[in-house]
Amino acid sequence: GDTVTSNRSSFTIVSLGFSKKIIKRNNAKIGDDIYVTGNLGDSYIGLNILKKKIYIKKKFKNYFINKYYLPDLPIKVLKFIHKFANSSIDISDGLFADLEKLINKQKLGFIINANYLPISKNLCFYLKKKNQKPLNFIGKGDDYQIIFTSSKKNRNYINKLSKRINQKITLIGTITNNYKQRMINRDGKLLKSSNYEGYFHNF
């Protein structure tokens, strides 16, 4: 993911270690809840401001650009995720693109509730002002949040943990047994997640 070019110097740091329990991306279970940390979409707005594709007031402009350059990494939850997650993946290419990777090679599907997708107050304000739908922005990538799946029996624990460590964790959907089912439920209407694909790597 860091094989890009820049006219500035850059440094990559790799840390290796041991884990008591490895959370794999391909271990989701039928009926698992799907969670995501943090907010989605801010970074995409910031990128498009930098590309001069979006023009916005300065007070919001700096907020979104900072979210692109310095995303809110969900570091606090990493210490606990092995206690409740069956599968997990980070969001770099976009919510729905990375969900596809999470269930790759498993005969599973998912339904995401669009009304529960977490967005910031600033993004909510921007979308209302521009009369835009959140789905057009939250699946584009560069969020660097975590998607994970967990048994329904862990809901209470996850809710309490979210408050205790002050880390936003949102229940957004369910893993299903229909491998052709990649859907978004928006106000009772089922939409194909492929309509909201994120970043595609050309290699």
Residue map of PLM features:
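Helix-biased detector of long, well-ordered alpha-helical tracts
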Residues: 1-203
